[in-house]
Structure formats: C-alpha cells, structure tokens
C-alpha cells in the first residue's frame, strides 16, 4: 500500500466526540498500539489570570497528582508508580493539561486518578507551602537563564502584560505570597467538567465515555466561570524592552561572557485562521537553528536563516524562526544570539531577513518547506502522547479536530503567492523586540532599522568574516 493510501486509510478513521450532561467533552481517535494515551485539557491557564491571582496557574500545575479527598499523597504516588509513572501536568497560556500513557488494562485507574487530581484535590497547607518554595526557586532559576526567560519577556511586551502577556511562571515574590484561598478559588472557578475535554487514543470511544461519565462528577454545585478566550483582551500592542544582566565579579572562577539574546516578532492570525498554513510554511522556510548542530549535519541546512545568516556570519551563535500560535492571535518572529561585540550589526541582519522574506521565493524552496512541514507533522503524530494532545487542544479550542489528511491537504494547497502575501502583511505591522544581555548599549532598534530598509530600498549589511559593513542594494 502506498504512503498516500495508508494516510487516506488512517484519516478515514475520524475522531469521535461526545458531550456529556455535565458539559465535559470526550474525544477519541483509534490506534493499534498496545498502550492507551489519555489526557484532560482544561480551559484555564495564565490567560485568565488577573493582578490578584497572577501566577496561580503555575501552582495548579505544580500541585497535580498530590493528595486528594480520597487518597494521601503517598497513596497517589504509589498508584502512579503502579501505572508506570508516565503522567504529567503542565500549564500553557490558554490551557492546563494533564495526560499520560498507560497499558490498556490500567485505563480505568488512570481516568479515576485524572478525575481526582483535577476535581477533588485536597490542597493541604503543607503541600502549598512546599510548592511556594519550589516555585520561587524555579522562577529564580529561570531568570538566571536568559535564553529561556526571553520568551516570557516577548509575550509580556507584545501583549501589554495581560491576557496572553501573562507569564506561565509565577514571579518569586508572588510565589512566596500566594495564598491557599487564591488557589482554591481558581480550582473552583475554572477546573469544572464543563470547561474540560478528555481525549484518548488507543481506547474504544464508548469505553472512555463510560469511564469519564463515572469519574468526572462535579464535587461542587457552584457554577463555573463562563468566561472564554474571546472575552479576554489579548490585543497586540508591540514595543521594545531590554534587560541588562549584571556582570559577575572579574574574579569569578567560572565566568564566561554572556551572549546577547534578541527576539523580534510580529502579530499573525490565530491558529484557527486559514493563514495558519502559509505562516507555518513560512516558519519552516526561514528555519534556522544554532551554529553548532548537536544532531549532526543536514538538518534544515537549506533554510533561509542557515544559508543567509548562520553560514555567512561567524559571530552569530544562533538564529531561528519561531511561531507562537493561539486561538485569538499569534506571533511570528526570529530569535537570535551573538557575542556582544557584534551588537551593532545584529538588528541589521534580522531586519534584512524580515524584509527579504517575500522576495525571490523559488518554487524549490517553497516545495521543500511544505514537504518538511508535512513530514514533521506526520512524524509527530506517530507518537500517541502527541496525538492525544493534538485532539485535546483542537477540541478545546474549536470543538472539532482537523484530521491529519485535512492538515496535509491544506499545507499542499499553500502557494508561493500565499507566502508573499502573509510575509508582506507581517512586516507591515509594528514589531516587538526584546533583548537580554550584559551590555546592550550598542544594540540598535529594530523598528528604526526596518524603517530605514523600507525608506531607502538599500541597507548596510555586515560582512561576516570581517565584521565590517558593505553597501548592498535590495
């Protein structure tokens, strides 16, 4: 059977979905695996946080699989160990998800455990106190890693520090002051069956519906919040922000010069918009990565940011396109890092790549990007854990799931003109720029650099080997 025929056969087995009287949705897709993957996806997360409870989602995810009203923490841990321990919880900006992969005969215990930890957590003072210390440490550790922290800065600046601009991490001082009442109020408001999707793969739909109907019974008669993503103000505002990291003492035994980390992004349509496909293709076409490839040569070496940036400028440590997709709006940008002595040149290189995105697109590189995107999508969906997350997230966001064949067909339909259109629309909007480093004094502003590119039609481009500038006509 040809690959196309196999894909068509797999896609014909469409996702099944059922809404129970409690409001909870159950969605499944078949799988021939010996394992079953199941997850609970909650319409919650930092997007709903306010100035009063900011950071509480970090506590909710950190308190997963602790004691419940029916079991102590040690009993819960023993149950997880018996299931293989392959269970986890994480908070994203628009949702909180609990999921895992277990053997088929362990599915009833797993569903019950997921129901107990989401609907019936004990939330003891001892557990919350322990989480305060742990989360404060995690937040302080994050601030010590600029390459990880810069993504949070990007969201805060792009969305004005609210809605999607809320961090998925709790600030250290907020963590120390987080009250148990705030956490319990958040659970009561948002962790309700009517705001949940239970997704599964490798399990019969009727079986999972039966298990969920018995386990996910609301523990309170209180009405949950009816607020949705569309009710939250997530307007893109843009702007720029720089964070200077203090230099350690010159006598520090392990001192290494910190790189300058920069991210530049523009707003793009949400993932529910048809333009998601050309934007995603554009991200793959731009590609990029690090100057050192740990996985060996050949990965994305023909992408724009490899050929135009990493292979040309020896001082560029990393340069990669990124996309953060959400239900109301999204971000598309480039993340880069370099040694501080080349700060004056960095934004000029990035601006040139943004301006050139819509120019000289060859049929070959467009086809290559589309094929890479399709192969990445299908290879990821070979994992049951990723498949169940795909089901849960799609159903939670749009009450339906686009099947793999639909996604592949939509990618195939992307044309060169589509890429030109979205690229030109992208750079016509105001950018967001964030930077982290020890010395940012000579870092230029991306907005001014882009304006100079657009005004003159030509710009100064750094010469990689010498680090000087030469005149390049655009």
UniProtKB/Swiss-Prot annotation:
- Pfam (any one): Peptidase_M16_C
Q: Which GO terms describe its biological process?
A: protein processing involved in protein targeting to mitochondrion
Record carries keyword Ligase? no
Which cellular component terms (GO) are annotated to the entry? mitochondrial inner membrane
Q: Name one GO molecular function term.
A: metal ion binding
Quaternary structure, from the entry: Heterodimer of mas2 (alpha) and mas1 (beta) subunits, forming the mitochondrial processing protease (MPP) in which mas2 is involved in substrate recognition and binding and mas1 is the catalytic subunit.
- Protein location: Mitochondrion inner membrane
Function noted in UniProt: Substrate recognition and binding subunit of the essential mitochondrial processing protease (MPP), which cleaves the mitochondrial sequence off newly imported precursors proteins.
What is the protein name given in its UniProt record? Mitochondrial-processing peptidase subunit alpha
Task: List the InterPro entries hit by this protein, alphabetically.
Answer: Metalloenz_LuxS/M16, MPP/UQCRC_Complex, Pept_M16_N, Peptidase_M16_C
**Origin superkingdom:** Eukaryota
Family as reported in the entry's similarity comment: Belongs to the peptidase M16 family.
Keyword list (alphabetical) reads: Membrane, Mitochondrion, Mitochondrion inner membrane, Transit peptide
